[in-house]
Amino acid sequence: MPSQKIRIRLKAFDHKLLDQSVGEIVDTAKRTGARVAGPIPLPTIINKYCVLRGPHVDKKSREQFEIRTHKRLIDILDPTQQTVDALMKLDLSAGVDVEIKL
C-alpha cells in the first residue's frame, strides 16, 4: 500500500487516557516500519452547562458544570500491510473514540 496515508483521530474526556492510547498507536506503527506524523493536539472542546441549584425559586443561585473533549490527530505515512493488521488487532481503552480515514 505505498503512497497512501492513514489518518487517525482520537477523542476522549480524559487526556491521560488519550495520550496513553496515542502512545500505543505510535509504537505499533513504528514497530511495523511505517512513518508517523504526530500526535498533533487539536483544540479542546469545552461544553458548559448552567443549572439552577434549587428546584423552586432563587434563580441567582446556579451551578456550572463543564465537560472537556480532548482530541489528537495521527498520520501514518506509507503504511504496510503489517501496519494495518497490527492496528486492527490493537486493543485500546473504552473511553477513547477512534476515527480512521484511509
Curated annotation (Swiss-Prot):
Family annotation (Pfam families): Ribosomal_S10
The Gene Ontology CC terms held by the record are: ribonucleoprotein complex; ribosome
User: What highest taxon heads this organism's lineage?
Assistant: Bacteria
Q: Which InterPro entries match?
A: Ribosomal_uS10 (IPR001848), Ribosomal_uS10_CS (IPR018268), Ribosomal_uS10_dom (IPR027486), Ribosomal_uS10_dom_sf (IPR036838)
GO process terms (BP): translation
Keywords on record: Ribonucleoprotein, Ribosomal protein
Note whether Ribonucleoprotein occurs among the keywords: yes
Q: Which GO terms describe its molecular function?
A: structural constituent of ribosome; tRNA binding
Subunit note: Part of the 30S ribosomal subunit.
Could you tell me what this protein does? Involved in the binding of tRNA to the ribosomes.
The entry's family comment says:
Belongs to the universal ribosomal protein uS10 family.
> What's the protein here called?
Small ribosomal subunit protein uS10
Q: Which organism is it from?
A: Geobacter metallireducens (strain ATCC 53774 / DSM 7210 / GS-15)
